[in-house]
Amino acid sequence: PSLCRVYKKTSGNESIALYLGKRDFVDHVESVDIVDGVIKVDPAELEGRKVWVYLACAFRYGSDDLDVIGLSFRKDIWVKRIQIYPVVGTRPANTPMQEALLKKCGDQGHPFTFTIDTNLPCSVGLQPAPEDAGKSCGVDYEVKAYIAKEADDPDEKISKKDTCRLIIRKIQFAPGKVGAGPKADISKNFMMSDKPVHLEASIEKELYFHGDPIPVNVKINNETTKVVKKIKITVEQTTEVLLYQSDKYSKTVLTEEFAEEIKGESTLEKTFTVIPLLSNNKEKRGLAVDVSGFPKTYIRPGMDKGMQGIMVSYKIKVNLLVSSGGLLGGLTASMIMHGPMS
């Protein structure tokens, strides 16, 4: 293919350079796009050392400024290494992407290919507060080329001028086949009333694009003499941080109130539309975000949930405000995700 853009990083000593044709790699649930790139090597500066490239999936949980006190805030989940120079063994046939990159870097180019395991998490981060410095908590992927005597010798100190790296993203789209949406219902009796208020809420499908309107269908049967004054719809993001501890918490990403009066012994059937947007939640610390906005984790049957690093799901709550002041109702559904690729 003709390359519209090449991502390139050169080491400080200019002995090696890393080339990629893209930085977003799609997780199709059953498989993941291969990571195919090229390393340009100038052997004159190697001094008998070798050139390696690695792809690492890491979980970070802290700020960079804390590293100065000797604490490690990065945990490698998965690492693969390939010796680039001198060339050893046989290599797979070049991909069209690698052929295009080799034309950019000439005779000193050496292709590499990584296959990302399907059970690894997607790139996601927890949004820091505006005043926070350094990296937030999250999962990222790094491609790094380096010059060393051995691939991974803890006693060998590798100088920064002998390395070059690029951060890439593993992203996930919704499956093309989308299931029917969830439905929840509840009834509640109030004091001084022998009949209940019935609430039913549903959505048409279980997955939505970020930025898409979400129609919430609401049915109310008020058998009491009390008046339903207001309907409140809330969308919550639930995040599970699985790697360093069992940590689960929720953030509200949308709250909207609708002034609908349902008098005693009457009914209402109506659709209310809500649109949760990341742009309305920029100040919220700890909100899970990714390249498209709000992320959602899609798990293949049999996949180890503990490998996902950060699990993200959503629920919608529908509450009725009744004249007595009591709150009624509840709808829980996993529904927001990237849309399918077209």
Which residues fall in each region the model found?
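C-terminal beta-sandwich interaction modules and adjacent acidic
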Residues: 1-342
